[in-house]
């Protein structure tokens, strides 16, 4: 156990050290928010995959694998598919906009009020995703090391806040690459093979596990559809994802490195689902399936390897927490504070650091108060997709879209999502379905009844 603690200490110090190094590279606002738009294919692939694959993708997919077998991969598969489509279909338009936030696109195409409303929704989304990741830090360390949940959240979340505040996107890029390597080794080369071997191999797993555990449809077509609506479309419009696109040095990097990141995500989902299925063989009576990742780590790994695999989980979690923290802070600063609350304010690194720190404190407070990771993630994606998908995609693809249609669409989609969550529960499939239908119907009807907006314009270098 001492060796595991030493590994975790080295990991934490490395993250802080990379954050300090990133601070030295962040000389301008562009450096802090989008790494100067200078990332090549290697750095871009690693940082894109790292921000997508967080606590829900790792711990949540192992949990789904424990409950449903291989079909637990669908959540992460849809995220990967969204990254692929975003990279191949929309990358050229997005890269040429030369903006910092998704919701700046709403103002460019529609009007200022759509940027404000969209910004509020986007801040709520990114903050909630950061909260789910921070909660997962506490869950993993509590189960594996016996550290109480709240101190673990404060310690792990505090590290995320420090390196995010001091170095911005450059710190996130450097830490993401190390985290990408750690979780690749920890998941694919250590935990996956040792879990399957501990369960007696794939053949024995097929014999022992309930029927359907190796059927890709076992989780249910309705759940697969919900994952498609939430996570595929969520990947298309999330600020945390777009902000990584803005870091690339060229459209070619976005296209091909993004394709690689999407494929990596799909393979990662399959690996985590198989780990969960192996945990079901070895630990069939877990009272809390969400602890499957931590429990199988304790069950099959020796000291040292256990520390590496816990570091892999924390790498996945912290990369998403930091990415969404910076995304929420960027939208709050660019789309709300500097644009509406204090118009004319000159954005600089000091302001960015203060707002990032403010959002980090909010992240820690909420993480200490909220317990259910999947519920919090569902709220975030329901609001994001139900409220913003239609007007953002419409801004890119539909010339007839109007400002009034965009605003009405955001409001109608969010209200429908909130009403359905209140009526049917946070984990129900209905909120995203009715939210999208309300958003789309309102967008089309109001746009056709009003004057269309001007087309988007590429911005100068």
Residue ranges and their predicted role:
Residues 1-461:
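Membrane-embedded helix-loop-helix hairpins and adjacent transmembrane boundary segments
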């Amino acid at each position: 156990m001492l060796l595991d603690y030493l590994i975790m200490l080295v990991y934490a110090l490395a993250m802080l050290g990379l954050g300090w190094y990133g601070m030295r590279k962040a000389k301008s606002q562009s450096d802090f928010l989008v790494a100067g738009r200078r990332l090549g294919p290697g750095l871009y692939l690693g940082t894109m995959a790292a921000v997508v694959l967080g606590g829900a993708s790792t711990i949540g997919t192992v949990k789904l694998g424990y409950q449903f077998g291989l079909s637990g991969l669908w959540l992460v598969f849809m995220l990967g598919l969204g990254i692929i489509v975003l990279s191949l279909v929309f990358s050229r338009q997005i890269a040429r906009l030369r903006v910092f936030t998704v919701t700046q696109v709403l103002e460019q195409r529609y009007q200022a009020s759509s940027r404000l409303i969209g910004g509020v929704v986007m801040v709520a989304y990114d903050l909630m995703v950061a909260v789910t990741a921070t909660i997962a830090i506490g869950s993993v360390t509590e189960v594996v090391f016996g550290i109480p949940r709240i101190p673990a959240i404060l310690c792990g979340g505090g590290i995320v806040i420090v390196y995010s505040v001091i170095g911005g996107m450059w710190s996130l890029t450097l830490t993401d690459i190390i985290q990408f390597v750690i979780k690749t080794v920890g998941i694919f080369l250590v935990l996956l093979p040792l879990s399957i071997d501990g369960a007696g191999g794939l053949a024995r797993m097929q014999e022992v596990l309930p029927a359907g555990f190796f059927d890709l449809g076992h989780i249910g077509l309705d759940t697969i559809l919900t994952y498609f609506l939430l996570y595929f479309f969520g990947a298309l419009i999330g600020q945390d994802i777009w902000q990584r696109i803005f870091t690339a040095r060229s459209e070619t990097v976005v296209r091909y490195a993004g394709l690689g990141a999407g494929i990596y995500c799909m393979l990662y989902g399959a690996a985590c689902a198989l780990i969960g299925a192996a945990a079901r063989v070895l630990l069939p009576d877990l009272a809390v399936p969400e602890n499957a990742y931590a429990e199988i780590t304790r069950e099959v790994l020796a000291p040292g390897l256990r520390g590496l695999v816990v570091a892999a989980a924390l790498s996945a979690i912290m990369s998403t927490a930091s990415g969404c923290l910076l995304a929420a802070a960027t939208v709050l600063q660019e789309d709300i504070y500097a644009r509406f609350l204090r118009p004319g304010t000159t954005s600089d690194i000091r302001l960015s650091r203060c707002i990032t720190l403010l959002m980090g404190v909010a992240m820690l407070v909420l993480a200490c108060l909220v317990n259910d990771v999947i519920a919090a993630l569902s709220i975030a994606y329901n609001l994001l997709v139900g409220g913003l998908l239609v007007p953002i995609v419409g801004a890119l693809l539909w010339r007839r879209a109007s400002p009034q249609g965009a605003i009405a669409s955001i409001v109608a989609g969010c209200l429908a999502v909130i009403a359905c969550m209140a009526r049917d529960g946070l984990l129900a499939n209905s909120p995203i379905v009715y939210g999208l239908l309300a958003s789309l119907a309102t967008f089309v009807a109001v746009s056709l009844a009003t004057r269309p907006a001007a087309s988007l314009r590429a911005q100068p270098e």
